[in-house]
Amino acid sequence: MKMAITALVLAAVVITGAVVTPARAQSGYETEPVLNAKDLAVADLLKGPHFTVNPKVPVKGFIERFTIQSSYGTFKANGLRMLPIRVNEVEALAKLDDLSKTKEFAEAAGKAIARPVTSTVNMLAHPVDTITGFPDGVGRLFDRIKLGGERVYQAATAPGASGGERASEASKRVGMATINAMGFEKERRDLAKSLGVDPYTTNEVLSEKLTDAAWVAFSGRFLIQTTTSILVPYSMAMSAATITNSTVYDTPPGDLINNATMIFGSTGATDAQVQALVQNPQYSLTTLTELAMGIQRLQGVPGRDAVVIFAAAARTQDECRFVAGAINMLARYHEAVAPIAQVSAPGPILGRTAGGALVVPMPVDYVAWLERLGVAANRPDLQAPEKVAFISGRMTPRAQKEFTKRGWKISESFTTAAER
């Protein structure tokens, strides 16, 4: 399964001569291009029975932004890693649609009690990814981030808040269902697992459909997994949840939050700093768990508290996924290449080996030579006898040249799938 996922994603990043060359800005820097989808992903991820991916893919903030037109709506896949996830979700929607039309499901729906009128799926009323002022992909995270005076979330530092109150606030995040009937939440997780999708998906349409179907199964005593075979063609791609080794499927959400809180606290971060991260609603529970597991893989490495503080400042779901991906890339380097002796996160996340090498993980798709990179490459705190950047995607020839000229070694296609 893992090999299939890796092969699919790696095949999707093969670059041909047809890829658009980024324009050269008058300042000497490049501008981010619009690429051709057919040059980025295999055909099966671009068109299927229920979806078509737009042929043009703009790059913004180092992230390739795919648009998926489907029978169930238009969906955005920000990043090559997200494309198979969103495509799989469309196929899952088709299966749920087919399921809802069966005689058995109709009978179960007739037996089911009414869903609580207050039940819903927590989706941000105005997703920060689209708010004017944050249209930047993950580019902001390569700048120095001013964290000292920034109050990320007031609730995180509210005096007198009990543990229960803070846990309640932590559950108010993107992708969380709010039906509290005993046993329902597990039914929903099991359904998501059978479909090969993230139970805490940020796809609002799928999340609501999962809740609807799981409620019928739970309340109407309809055995979905035994009565109906749900096999999704793109389940080989699975979801972001695969990075957590099925933890998000098998563990109640309250336990996931408590486990993440404990791991973040073990870094030496203060309670207020930990709560600022845990209560950041832009982190889906899956991404928060992925981040916690990455930090745990670096257990004992000084400086992990800086990652907690940095992670809490994420403003968008793109930035949250970047932080989680970066720390897991760094953990893989620590485990497989050379031990990391120190972690810091001035913007971006950095690792230093005992030999003094500087390691920068970059879970991004496409790196053009932008002005912010020119500034970052010359920063005093980003200098070392040996400097290595690992990129899950690739750089333009110009960016490669400029980084190499400044003493950097670049490793491309260091895929996030390989973190596992």
Identify the role of each PLM range.
Residues 263-348:
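Acidic-basic catalytic patches of nuclease active cores, encompassing PD-(D/E)XK
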Residues 322-382, 386-391:
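Conserved catalytic cores of phosphodiester-cleaving nucleases, focusing on short active-site segments
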Residues 7-18:
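Bacterial N-terminal signal peptides
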Residues 19-25:
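Sec/Tat signal peptide C-region and signal peptidase I cleavage site
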Residues 94-147, 165-232:
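Amphipathic interfacial helices
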Residues 394-420:
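Domain-level recognition of nuclease-like catalytic cores that cleave nucleotide substrates
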Residues 26-155:
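Cationic, glycine-rich low-complexity segments
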Residues 138-160, 236-279:
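Membrane-engaging insertion elements
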